[in-house]
A protein has these predicted regions:
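Membrane-lumen/periplasm interface segments of specific transmembrane helices
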Residues: 34-67, 91-95
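Signature aromatic-anchored transmembrane alpha helix within multi-pass, membrane-resident enzymes
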Residues: 155-185
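Hydrophobic/aromatic-rich transmembrane helices and adjacent perimembrane loops
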Residues: 131-159, 166
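Transmembrane alpha-helix segments characteristic
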Residues: 44, 105-128
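Luminal/periplasmic acceptor-recognition loop/helix of membrane-associated glycosyltransferases
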Residues: 195-221, 225-272, 276
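Hydrophobic, aromatic-rich transmembrane alpha-helices
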Residues: 87-108
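Perimembrane helix-loop-helix junctions
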Residues: 18-44, 73, 99-105
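Membrane-interface alpha helices of multi-pass inner-membrane proteins
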Residues: 1-13, 22-25, 43-45, 125
Length: 277
């Protein structure tokens, strides 16, 4: 089962390798266990199709993650990372976690692994800020260790336990309110995430059934397809990363057919007249 779990983590997110690494570091005796190597071989067999695909496409996503995201260092990478860290793990609970992690000892292999995963992810991505911006969601695997530490640290500390329970209920209520706003937008906020459906439906109406070619933005093409169910394509750009649209045959299928070219210019949307592509 360990081999299957490691393979599923690899398919889900490459950061799954960090989970395995930190588990091994928390219990080096695994390196003396033959079953661990059998699990690794099973993992390798299960991800072999993905590795073969990577080989056929010049290791495209590996190269992107190892080098394509590298940018000149900015202090804002560190400050934003720390702010996001507090926001993700709750600014009212994260200080408690830090104190609990320092005082709580892992008395079992599982607890040691959870402690190592939580600290390892936080420190690893803190170091990664020297190479570029770190996405907040990359820290999610550390959540399991944070929860375990908070639970253990509150044992025998009734006052602290009541504090965490209260903060937890308040947090759940706030998350529910944010979710309601994101789904229904009763406040009429103009943030991009709240206005996607209307703006992309506007483009779809102008396209009138024709495919839409987005100028260099694979995210806009993907969101257009999601919100409208219509055909979209992202024109490759030498100034931006490689996307899945460069691996598909959309340009061949759309050749010679009428299409709409969409270009973002600040807050304005310019839609060209139908042309032959």
């Amino acid at each position: 089962w360990m081999g299957i779990a490691m393979a599923l983590m690899a398919y889900s997110k490459y950061h799954g390798a960090l989970v395995v690494l930190f588990i091994v570091l928390s219990n080096l005796r695994l390196l003396k266990n033959p079953k661990f190597y059998v699990a690794c071989l099973l993992t390798l067999a299960l991800i072999a199709p993905h590795l073969w695909w990577q080989y056929q496409h010049d290791w495209i996503s590996f190269r992107y993650h190892l080098d394509g995201r590298t940018r000149d260092f900015e202090y804002s990478f560190v400050t934003e990372y720390l702010l996001n860290l507090f926001a993700i793990f709750n600014p009212f609970l994260f200080p408690v976690f830090l104190k609990g992690w320092w005082k709580t000892k892992g008395h079992t292999p599982v607890l040691r692994a959870l402690n190592c995963i939580s600290a390892g992810f936080i420190l690893f991505f803190l170091a990664s800020t020297t190479r570029g911006y770190v996405q907040p969601q990359w820290e999610i695997p550390a959540t399991f260790g944070v929860i375990a530490v908070l639970y253990l640290f509150t044992q025998g500390r009734e006052r602290l336990r009541r504090y965490i329970v209260r903060v937890g209920w308040i947090t759940i209520a706030l998350i529910a309110l944010v979710r309601i706003e994101m789904i229904f937008n009763p406040l009429g906020l103009k943030f991009e995430v709240f206005d996607n459906r209307a703006s992309y439906n506007e483009i779809a109406a102008a396209a009138d059934g024709r495919p839409v070619i987005f100028d260099g933005s694979y995210t806009d093409a993907a969101k257009y397809g999601f919100y409208t169910g219509r055909t979209a394509y992202a024109q490759p750009s030498i100034r931006y990363r490689t996307s899945q649209y460069e691996l598909k045959d959309d340009d061949d299928r759309m050749a010679g057919k009428p299409a709409i070219l969409q270009v973002w210019d600040l807050s304005l949307i310019h839609i060209s007249e139908p042309t032959r592509h």
